Curated annotation (Swiss-Prot):
This is Large ribosomal subunit protein eL39. GO terms for biological process: translation. It comes from Kluyveromyces marxianus. Belongs to the eukaryotic ribosomal protein eL39 family. PROSITE patterns: RIBOSOMAL_L39E. GO terms for molecular function: structural constituent of ribosome. Keywords: Ribonucleoprotein, Ribosomal protein. It comes from the Eukaryota. One of its GO terms (cellular component) is cytosolic large ribosomal subunit.
Amino acid sequence: MAAKKSFIIKQKLAKAKNQNRPLPQWFRLKTNNTIRYNAKRRHWRRTKLVC
């Protein structure tokens, strides 16, 4: 990744960084909740971004 990034690329990287986290524990405790983990987790070395 270049040191000089365009603002659009920087925004996409920031969004991907925020999305790459586990589910909050309080969300798992909600009634009738079937979601157990974040299926869209991304590892920085295994799966690269398309942006």
